[in-house]
A protein has these predicted regions:
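Short conserved active-site loop signatures built around small residues
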Residues: 1
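Metal-dependent de-N-acetylase/amidase catalytic core
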Residues: 4-20, 24-61, 67-269
Length: 269
């Protein structure tokens, strides 16, 4: 939904972006090595190697990764670094789309922090974290991932946490919900069936290119990403192909012809 985010910003809306999970297990070890080389080099160049914490951690992590075997779990330090890499990429993408950094929220939901592909069960703690954010922001629109085809189930749990938080706010009689609509989009694995689509946001060639540029800010999720799935296309290629296919379907139905379209289904709590 990168095109929709860009459109909302251009129209002057107060846009907030919430990253529900750290995304740390979806970062390859070579990304950690690259960033550790950088920070160690920075320490050598500008601090005369005076930061002993950096030196010690650099050696610890380098040794661990050199001896890591397939199936070994990452240490908490490495998972933290991988999460930090994802945060940096997210901030870069948001800055590219003119979203202020104080409108970028990293929730780090606990269910994700198992350090493994299989996540922990979603708990009340996860829901309360999401609830606090939405009750503070009081949005007029909420966009959530309806990616039920996600092979790892993370998107489903993230969406469930948001919907559970909305239900709790509704039960509490939150007035802001009366002016709020919830839209579900799909990501890398599937698109909504055309008969179920309730809103489409068209994109020009320039807007589609801007969406691609935003995706490319997430460098750790390109060629070497651990969980690309069976589809050999990169995430930006999948997104463009799917958005163009949606626009083509509407063109064949006799509607206006656009370069691409993002599709949404409304969730009614």
């Amino acid at each position: 939904m990168g095109g929709t985010v860009n459109r909302l910003v251009q129209q002057g809306h107060d846009v907030h972006v919430a990253y529900e999970t750290s995304g740390n297990i979806a970062v390859g070890d070579e990304e950690v090595t690259r960033f550790m080389h950088f920070i160690n080099g920075f320490n050598q160049l500008f601090a005369d190697e005076s930061d002993q914490v950096i030196k010690r951690k650099y050696e610890e992590i380098k040794t661990f990764l050199a001896n890591k075997k397939q199936g070994d779990s990452d240490t908490r330090d490495i998972l933290t670094i991988k999460g930090l890499i994802r945060r940096g990429e997210a901030r870069t993408a948001c800055t590219y789309n003119h979203i202020p950094l104080d409108h970028v929220h990293f929730l780090d939901l606990p269910f994700y922090e198992s350090g493994k592909i299989e996540k922990l069960p979603m708990s009340e703690m996860d829901v309360n974290i999401v609830r606090k954010l939405i009750s503070d922001v009081k949005p007029h629109q909420i966009y959530v991932a309806g990616d039920l085809a996600d092979p790892h189930g993370t998107h489903r749990k993230c969406t469930d946490a948001v919907l559970a938080a909305i239900d709790m706010e509704k039960e509490a009689g939150a007035e802001w919900l009366k002016d709020c609509r919830v839209w579900m989009y799909r990501g890398a694995w599937a698109e909504w069936e055309i008969e179920n689509i309730e809103m489409c946001v068209p994109m020009s060639p320039e807007e589609l290119r801007a969406k691609r540029n935003s995706i490319l800010k997430h460098q750790s999720q390109m060629e070497s990403a651990p969980f690309l799935g069976d589809d050999e296309r990169l995430f930006w290629q999948r997104a463009e192909d799917r958005n163009r296919a949606t626009a083509s379907l509407y063109d064949k139905l006799g509607l206006a012809c656009y370069e691409a379209m993002e599709a949404f289904v409304e969730y009614k709590p």
